[in-house]
Amino acid sequence: MRILVEIAYQGNQFLGFQIQQQGRTVQQQFEKILKRMHKHHVRIHPSSRTDRGVHAYQQFFHFDTELNIDNKQWQYAMNRALPDDIYVKNVRNVDEYFHCRYDCVGKRYRYKVYQGNHRNPFKSGTETFVNETLDYDKMNKAAQEFIGTHDFTGFCSQKTEVESKVRTLYQSEIVATKEGFDYVVTGSGFLYNMVRVLVAFLIEVGKGKREPNDVPKLLEDKNRNNVPLTAPPDGLYLEKIYLSPEELIQEYGKDIKIHYKKSLEKH
């Protein structure tokens, strides 16, 4: 039986989602609970592997079990055993061929920035502080340039190992908030550190050090040395996982380009 679990977590005290040889991770917390319940190791499969310090409003993982436990009981048992910085929002059964990673057709991230005369210690780890004056309109114009299908080689970590760095962005915008701004970006998928590099670049645009019309050339050049800065992880939130094309179409229209991942478990 395959179980799908929806969770949220604050990433401050985690070394990321994926299990590490040493250190606290989200995967480690759940696999420890499942091992205790099953009396053997049970691997979980996430929709996304967030990095150290990154938060999630919505994240999914699935696992296989032989235990006959009601979904509400799964939720109760996990939440009772979990630390306060992780919460199980929902548990449900899925088809045996469903796979969290391969059936994920899109993700939305939100990056939070606050501004002011000084840092707020109560926002430490959850939002990023920028004290310079920023031109939000100019930043939003630059953000719009990223919408569409592009090769984002120049806007990701040089450690990125995937073969294709082509991704499609359906949404890329600056949203003004009471104390600063949020950068909201939705796409077919994201490369290592891609959102944080985009944010760092947009902040440079806001400071007047870059221009919106720099974007097409930077995308074409595919050179990370031309976009050297990376924003800290503190303000980054995985906000939504799209597990069906219908969800994406409902929000962004029927003409969008959807990238389907081949599920290895179906073959």
Curated annotation (Swiss-Prot):
Annotated catalytic residues: 51
Record EC number: 5.4.99.12
UniProt-recorded Gene Ontology molecular function terms: RNA binding; tRNA pseudouridine(38-40) synthase activity
Catalytic activity: uridine(38/39/40) in tRNA = pseudouridine(38/39/40) in tRNA
Residues the entry annotates as binding substrate: 109
GO biological processes: tRNA pseudouridine synthesis
InterPro entries listed in its UniProt record: PsdUridine_synth_cat_dom_sf, PsdUridine_synth_TruA, PsdUridine_synth_TruA_a/b_dom, PsdUridine_synth_TruA_C, TruA/RsuA/RluB/E/F_N
Protein keywords: Isomerase, tRNA processing
Entry keyword Isomerase: yes
Function of the molecule: Formation of pseudouridine at positions 38, 39 and 40 in the anticodon stem and loop of transfer RNAs.
Subunit architecture: Homodimer.
Family recorded in the similarity comment: Belongs to the tRNA pseudouridine synthase TruA family.
Protein name (record): tRNA pseudouridine synthase A
Species per Swiss-Prot/TrEMBL record: Staphylococcus epidermidis (strain ATCC 12228 / FDA PCI 1200)
